[in-house]
Amino acid sequence: MPLVVKICGLSTRATLDAALAAGADMVGFVVFPASPRHVDLALARQLGDATGDRAAKVALTVDADDALLESVIETLRPDILQLHGHESAARVAEIRRTFGLPVMKVLGVASAADLAPLPDYAAVADRILFDARAPKGASRPGGLGAVFDWQLLRDLDLALPFMVSGGLTADNVAEAVRITGAGGVDISSGVETAPGVKDPDLIRAFIRAARASQELMI
């Protein structure tokens, strides 16, 4: 299966166009005011319309209530909901049932103990995204440029697709894919020059490196 490449936290037309032109499979839009990558609903609509069907649109929310999710879905018309907060497995199932969209649940990882909830989430989500667990007291759950121990996912037996994120760059994405066997990679801060400021050249370089990483495994 081709490696799925997601560029997350896009907030300008120029960087969105760069990601799409470079062949991103998924583009992520963050609706979470505490994040430097936050886009309001008006901008989300513009970026979603510009994306069209060239890539899957992913709406990232954090512990959102139904009212916010409904607004995001109506405005952005996403293909996937990314739940990046402390949503329980029951809440994931409820969101999936209520809104009828595929759900990608993010699981923060710092040690093997963080994988304990995985079976419960795998039973209700459509895709799992493993990210570095944010340190205690952090103002946001991801996009911090931190790497987790990929060896924790080696030989992972998971019946549904999974992706990895957290501190990825063009220089280390091949190793991340090789060790974890992930079917997809997700990057945000690794293609930025400052928090929330995406760089088209870094986006292109990352996507090239991600594609090359799969060729090396064939």
From Swiss-Prot:
Q: Say which family it is in.
A: Belongs to the TrpF family.
Q: Which pathway does this chain act in?
A: Amino-acid biosynthesis; L-tryptophan biosynthesis; L-tryptophan from chorismate: step 3/5
* Entry annotated with the keyword Amino-acid biosynthesis: yes
**Encoding gene per record:** trpF
Q: Which InterPro entries match?
A: Aldolase_TIM, PRAI_dom, RibuloseP-bd_barrel, TrpF_fam
The family database entries (Gene3D superfamilies) matched by this protein are listed as:
Aldolase class I (3.20.20.70)
Q: Pfam families from the entry?
A: PRAI (PF00697)
**HAMAP family hit by this protein:** PRAI
Q: Which GO terms describe its biological process?
A: L-tryptophan biosynthetic process
**Annotated protein name in UniProt:** N-(5'-phosphoribosyl)anthranilate isomerase
According to UniProt, the reaction catalysed is: N-(5-phospho-beta-D-ribosyl)anthranilate = 1-(2-carboxyphenylamino)-1-deoxy-D-ribulose 5-phosphate
